[in-house]
C-alpha cells in the first residue's frame, strides 16, 4: 500500500516549534526577512544538518539575497551545472555537519533543467508563515508540487491528494493538456489509497513532456559552457592530496569525504609508482614509459583544475610528491625522472598526511612490514619541512573522526578562498 511519504511531508510542510529550526538556518531566514524580499521554503529538513533546503526566491532578488546569506556564514558554491539555481553551503556552527541552501528562481517541474512552470510569483504570494517563523508554500501547492515531482522522484514523493484550486492545476493543464490536472489528482488519490497503477501510467505520459530535452547542439554547447564554468557565479573549488603509507586509511577517507561533503567531489589518482601489468612493450623502452606517465599525470591534473574551476572539491588519491619518498640513493637517471615527475603537476591547496605508527598500519592491511611502513611514515612527515601547506592528521582515530576532521579542513580552506 502506497502512503504519503512522512519524511517528505514533514520536511516540506511540517512547522513545529522554533527550537526545531537549526540556528544557522534561522539566521539565514531572518536575513531574508530583514531584506523585505518574498521567499518560501519548498522542501528540506530544518532541524538537522545534511540535505538541501530548497527556497523559492524571485530572480530579481538574487543580487541582494546571496550577499545577505553570505553575511550569515554561508558561501556561494560555483555550480554551473545547476544554473539558474544558486547553491550556498556552510559548515554548521557546531562543526557537526553541512547545511545547503538551494535558491530556486524558477520552478522546474521534473528535476534540474526540466520544463519550468510560470507560477513562482503566485506560489510566493500564497506562501504561509508558520509558528516557527518559517515561510512555506501553501499546503495545496505543496501537494501539487509533490505530484509533479513524482515524475522525477516516483510515487513515493506524494504528500497528499491535490485539490483543484490555486495556480498549479491551470499550469498543469496548460503544459500537459486540458483535463491533466483532474486526472492527476484522481490518480494520486488512488495511489494514496493503495493502488498506484493509474498514477504510474500517468507519470509515464507526463515525464517526456516535463523533461523536455534541448537539441543536441544546445546540449553540447551547454556541456562546454558548464565544463569551463563560463560566467558562473560562486567560489571555485579546492584540491586536497591525501597521503600516507599503505594502511593509513587513504581509501576509506576519500570514499567517506565523497559521500559526506555536499560539494561536488572529483577523485583523481596522481600516484607515480603504481605498476601496470598490461603495459605494452613499446612503453618499456627507456624514456618512453616516463613520457607517457608524465603526459597522463599532466592530463589528470589539468582535468582536476577544470573541476576546481567548476566549484568541485578535488581529492588527489596520492600525489606526485611520492617521488620524494623513494628510499636509498637514486641514480642520476632516477633523479632526473623523479624531478620531472615532481614538477609534472601543481601542488594542491593542502597536503593531508594520515599519520599512524607502522605497526598499526601493518595490523590494518598486512602489507610490507612494520619497519618499512614506519620508515615511509617518517618520510611523509618530512614533507612538512618542504611545504608549508601540509596538515598531519592523527590516523589512529576511528575512520569517522578522521573524516570529520578533514571535512572541517575542507571547509576552512574553501571558505577562506577568494
Regions flagged by a language model, labelled:
Residues 250:
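Conserved lysine of the Walker
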Residues 258-298:
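Conserved substrate/cofactor phosphate-moiety recognition/catalytic segment
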Residues 245:
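P-loop (Walker A) phosphate-binding loop of NTP-binding proteins
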Residues 209-216, 366-418:
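NTP-dependent small-molecule kinase module
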Residues 2-238:
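Conserved NTP-donor binding/palm subdomain of two-metal-ion nucleotidyltransferases/polymerases, i.e.
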Residues 286-345:
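Glycine-rich phosphate-binding loop used to anchor ATP phosphates in small-molecule kinases
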Residues 253:
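Hydrophobic positions on the alpha1 helix immediately C-terminal to the Walker A/P-loop
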Residues 321-382, 391, 396:
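A glycine- and Lys/Arg-enriched "phosphate-lid" helix/loop adjacent to the NTP-binding pocket
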Amino acid at each position: 500500500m502506497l502512503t504519503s511519504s512522512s519524511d517528505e511531508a514533514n520536511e516540506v510542510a511540517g512547522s513545529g516549534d522554533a527550537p526545531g529550526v537549526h540556528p544557522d538556518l534561522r539566521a539565514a531566514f531572518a536575513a531574508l526577512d530583514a531584506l523585505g524580499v518574498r521567499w518560501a521554503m519548498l522542501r528540506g529538513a530544518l532541524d538537522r544538518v545534511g540535505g538541501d533546503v530548497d527556497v523559492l526566491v524571485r530572480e530579481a532578488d538574487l543580487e541582494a539575497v546571496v550577499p545577505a546569506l553570505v553575511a550569515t556564514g554561508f558561501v556561494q558554491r560555483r555550480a554551473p551545472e545547476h544554473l539558474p539555481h544558486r547553491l550556498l553551503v556552510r559548515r554548521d556552527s557546531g562543526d557537526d555537519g553541512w547545511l545547503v541552501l538551494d535558491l530556486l528562481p524558477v520552478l522546474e517541474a521534473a528535476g534540474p533543467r526540466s520544463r519550468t512552470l510560470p507560477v513562482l510569483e503566485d506560489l510566493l504570494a500564497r506562501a504561509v508563515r508558520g509558528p516557527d517563523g518559517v515561510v512555506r508554500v501553501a499546503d495545496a501547492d505543496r501537494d501539487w508540487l509533490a505530484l509533479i515531482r513524482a515524475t522525477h522522484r516516483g510515487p513515493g514523493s506524494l504528500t497528499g491528494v491535490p485539490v483543484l484550486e490555486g495556480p498549479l492545476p491551470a499550469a498543469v493543464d496548460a503544459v500537459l493538456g486540458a483535463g491533466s490536472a483532474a486526472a492527476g489528482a484522481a490518480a494520486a488519490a488512488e495511489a494514496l489509497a493503495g493502488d498506484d497503477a493509474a498514477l504510474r501510467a500517468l507519470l509515464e505520459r507526463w515525464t517526456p513532456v516535463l523533461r523536455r530535452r534541448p537539441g543536441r547542439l544546445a546540449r553540447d554547447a551547454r556541456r562546454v559552457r558548464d565544463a569551463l564554468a563560463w560566467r558562473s557565479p560562486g567560489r571555485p573549488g579546492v584540491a586536497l592530496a591525501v597521503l600516507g603509507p599503505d594502511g593509513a586509511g587513504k581509501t576509506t577517507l576519500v570514499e567517506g569525504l565523497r559521500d559526506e561533503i555536499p560539494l561536488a567531489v572529483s577523485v583523481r589518482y596522481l600516484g607515480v609508482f603504481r605498476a601496470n601489468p598490461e603495459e605494452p612493450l613499446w612503453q618499456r623502452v627507456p624514456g618512453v614509459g616516463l613520457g607517457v606517465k608524465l603526459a597522463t599525470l599532466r592530463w589528470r591534473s589539468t582535468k582536476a583544475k577544470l573541476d576546481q574551476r567548476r566549484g568541485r572539491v578535488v581529492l588527489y588519491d596520492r600525489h606526485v610528491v611520492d617521488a620524494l619518498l623513494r628510499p636509498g640513493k637514486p641514480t642520476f637517471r632516477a633523479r632526473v625522472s623523479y624531478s620531472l615527475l615532481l614538477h609534472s603537476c601543481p601542488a594542491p591547496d593542502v597536503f593531508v598526511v594520515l599519520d599512524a605508527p607502522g605497526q598499526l598500519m601493518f595490523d590494518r592491511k598486512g602489507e610490507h612490514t612494520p619497519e618499512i611502513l614506519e620508515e615511509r611514515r617518517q618520510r611523509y612527515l618530512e614533507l612538512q619541512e618542504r611545504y608549508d601547506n601540509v596538515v598531519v592528521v592523527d590516523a589512529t582515530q576511528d575512520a569517522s573522526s578522521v573524516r570529520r576532521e578533514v571535512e572541517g579542513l575542507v571547509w576552512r580552506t574553501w571558505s577562506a578562498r577568494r
